[in-house]
Amino acid sequence: MKFFAISLFGAALLGACATPVADAPEATLVEARAAPAEVAVAETAPEAEMVVAPAAIDVAAVSGALAAAETRSDEDKARDAGRKPAEVLAYLGIKPGDTAADFIASGGWYTEVLSIAVGPDGTVYAQNSEAALALRDRAYDKALTARLAGDRLANVVRKDEELTALTIPAASVDVALTGLNFHDVYNAYGPEAAVGFLSAIRGTLKPGGVLGVIDHAGVPGADNNELHRIDPALAVASAEAAGFRVEVNSDILSSAADDHTKNVFDPAVRGQTDRFILKLTNPE
C-alpha cells in the first residue's frame, strides 16, 4: 500500500491525459472474391503452420515458482498469502511471454511477481514518477534499485518517467497492473485526474489488452480519503469514462475481517483489507 502525492497529476496530466483515448477504429470489412475459373489451382496447397497461443499461467506452478524464487525476500514472500498474486494474474489472463507493465511500481513487489509470471520470453516495464521515487528519503528508488541490481530480473525494463511522457511503446502491452494506488490518485486529485491516469495507461495497451486495478474497498459516505480507500463504484465510473470495458471481482481478495471503517494501516486490518479487482479491457 503506497500513499503519496504524485507529481504527474498536475496541470500537464489534467490537460493532456484527462481526455479519454479514442476508441480504436472499426476494422474495414473486405469482401473476398472468387478466383477466376481459368486460374489453375495448385494440386497440393502447402499446409498452414498452426500457431498455438500460450495458455494463461498455471496458478499452482506460478505459486510454487514465487515461493521457491531465491531472488525474493522472506518479507516479499510473506505478502503472498494476503495478495494471492498467482490467482490475481491468472484472473487478468497473463501468459508466459507476455509484455506486462507495473504502473506506480514503487519498490517493485508486483514487478517481480510479473517478471516470474511472464518468464524469460516476456518483458515487464516498471514505471514510477520522480515524485514517487523521492518519497521517504528515496526509499522506493533504493528498493527498486536493489531489486534490479546485477540484472537479477533480466526481463524488467525500468521506466522512471511521468505518465505524461511515457516511452513505453503505444499499443504494446498485453497486461498492465496498478496495485493499491488508484485511491490515492482519485482522492488526492479528483475524478478528472483519475480518468487521465487510466487513459494514459490504456494508450500503452494492445487492442484487447487488460489493465488490472487492485485497491482497498471503501463504502459510500465514508471518509475514504482519510481511510486510504475508494468506493469501487467510483473506480468503475472512472474506468468507463476512460473507455474501458469493465469487469469487477470482489471475491479473490475479499476479507470478512474488514468492516471498511478502519484506516488500511490500522493493525487490525493491515494486510487483510477487503480489496476489489477491476479487470479493464481495452476494446479491440
Can you describe what each PLM-predicted range is?
Residues 115-116, 192-207:
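A short glycine-rich, Lys/Arg-flanked "PGG" loop and its adjoining helix->strand segment in the class I
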Residues 61-91, 95:
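Class I SAM-dependent methyltransferase Rossmann-like catalytic core
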Residues 124-125, 208-217:
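Conserved beta-strand signature within the Rossmann-like core of class I S-adenosyl-L-methionine
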Residues 14-16:
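C-terminal motif of bacterial Sec signal peptides marking the signal peptidase cleavage site
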Residues 18-21:
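Bacterial signal peptide processing site
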Residues 95-106:
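Conserved class I S-adenosyl-L-methionine
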Residues 242, 257-284:
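Core SAM-dependent methyltransferase catalytic element
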Residues 98, 166-177:
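A short acidic, Gly/Pro-enriched loop at the edge of an enzyme's catalytic core
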